[in-house]
Amino acid sequence: MNTRPFYFGLIFIAIIAILANYLGNTDFSHHYHISALIIAILLGMAIGNTIYPQFSTQVEKGVLFAKGALLRTGIVLYGFRLTFGDIADVGLNAVVTDAIMLISTFFFTALLGIRYLKMDKQLVYLTGAGCSICGAAAVMAAEPVTKAESHKVSVAIAVVVIFGTLAIFTYPLFYTWSQHLINAHQFGIYVGSSVHEVAQVYAIGENIDPIVANTAVISKMIRVMMLAPFLLMLSWLLTRSNGVSENTSHKITIPWFAVLFIGVAIFNSFDLLPKELVKLFVEIDSFLLISSMAALGLTTQASAIKKAGLKPFVLGILTYLWLVVGGFLVNYGISKLI
């Protein structure tokens, strides 16, 4: 068995990931809140649509491994970023709000995209995952469950990145208007429950107030912890929608990496490992996710994205409006009830 395409592919991916990580830590990237994940997929797409086809057979096995196994490992290790103690810091209000926003946003996106915009179901589910939970990371986590092609994943990531970035500029303006309705703590929950990416949530909070920032990040991480049950629900929905009756012996596909993700988060909650080791796991996790994004970019053809048309972005802006307006109404209502 020729293993050279496997190892050469991993080395090639590692080089792109290292470059993306370096660029993601520059002052320019920090100022404009451009993460290494986004840089990795852009670099991957740039190479994938120019010189990569000339030597793809020499590295393809390693690239596909990075896109699959490294992604799943990265999602599992993501659990080291979370503890269940975080929930106590923001209270039941945030948990209920996050759950309502996750469910309502996903089904809003699915209904709008499939029934009214007549879009590809896989693309809609990926976009819904990204808008409902944690942006690009959720899209990547949903990819093995939906079994979507690379270009669909890239389109979904583009949608959540564009409108999540827009949120960085609009939410601080909205805070000024809403101060007479909700306090800083409640606005932090609103940000954490409705903005796409963790980095975007942090950026918004830092631009407003320390209380908003701390509450928003914790609220967002609670939303991230809902990734595993969401993937199980998505797997069940896909099985049912594919025409599997309750009387058949067909088994629902369980995304075990999602279950392990929760297991790691539970383990991390007991604070058994030295903080330096946990920090190392988080750094390894970041590199694995950056690597898988680079592999995703390499296997994405620009022509396939162009073929998707404007509908994904129409879906993105309508979902964004739901997150901003509907999200505020949900947060305001919950704050009065709990």
From Swiss-Prot:
Pfam families recorded: Cons_hypoth698
Keyword hit for Membrane: yes
Annotated membrane topology: Multi-pass membrane protein
Membrane-crossing segments per the record: 5-23, 33-55, 62-84, 94-116, 123-145, 155-177, 222-239, 254-273, 280-302, 312-334
S-S bonds: none
Cell compartments where the protein resides: Cell membrane
Keywords recorded for this protein, A-Z: Cell membrane, Membrane, Transmembrane, Transmembrane helix
An example Gene Ontology CC term for this record: plasma membrane
NCBIfam families: YeiH family putative sulfate export transporter
Family according to the record: Belongs to the UPF0324 family.
Protein name: UPF0324 membrane protein NMB1979
Taxonomy of the source species: Bacteria, Pseudomonadati, Pseudomonadota, Betaproteobacteria, Neisseriales
